[in-house]
């Protein structure tokens, strides 16, 4: 720095997410085992196993709090068991975020409704453990609006005007 100049704080360039170094089978294991753990927790009302499998940052939620968070799934009777046999489609391939967490988003294209997911994992003791989860059910594709009401047909016409009884002679 030159004498008489003021120090200037420079912004550090933001670190961009980078692809995760994980094979497809590893990704499928993480996604399926996580969603099945949630499915079992929702079906039994017991969230302790889901919590115990997760990272410490997720474990700040006790089992009762997790039951509150996922109460809507239980009310709707959400069944996630189909994730065992359907391959997920990824809208965001697994990537390492600047904070070191791995995130992936996508859906299982099941019919009549697809299962959408957003999962975040933390590296703990050499394993990826659940840090955040969002699961929702949505339509499998764009939904068309309802049919418009049937309009009354205008009276049929001919070149000479409205069609009616033949003229009297």
Annotate each language-model stretch with its function.
Residues 21-36, 40-101:
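Short solvent-exposed beta->alpha transition segments
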Residues 89-169:
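Exposed beta-sheet edge and beta->alpha loop/turn motif
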Residues 1-42, 138, 145-167:
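Juxtamembrane and targeting peptides
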């Amino acid at each position: 720095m030159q004498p008489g100049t003021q120090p200037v704080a420079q912004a550090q360039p933001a670190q961009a997410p980078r692809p995760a170094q994980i094979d497809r089978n590893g990704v499928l294991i993480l996604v399926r085992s996580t969603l099945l753990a949630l499915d079992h927790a929702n079906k039994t009302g017991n969230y302790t196993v889901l919590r115990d499998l997760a990272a410490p940052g997720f474990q700040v939620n006790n089992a009762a709090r997790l039951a509150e968070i996922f109460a809507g799934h239980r009310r709707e009777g959400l069944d996630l068991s189909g994730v065992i046999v359907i391959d997920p489609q990824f809208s965001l391939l697994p990537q390492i975020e600047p904070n070191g967490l791995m995130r992936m988003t996508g859906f299982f294209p099941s019919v009549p409704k697809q299962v959408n997911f957003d999962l975040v994992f933390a590296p703990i003791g050499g394993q990826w453990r659940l840090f955040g989860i969002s699961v929702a059910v949505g339509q499998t594709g764009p939904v068309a609006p309802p049919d418009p009401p049937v309009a009354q047909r205008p009276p049929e016409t001919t070149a000479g005007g409205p069609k009616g009884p033949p003229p009297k002679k």
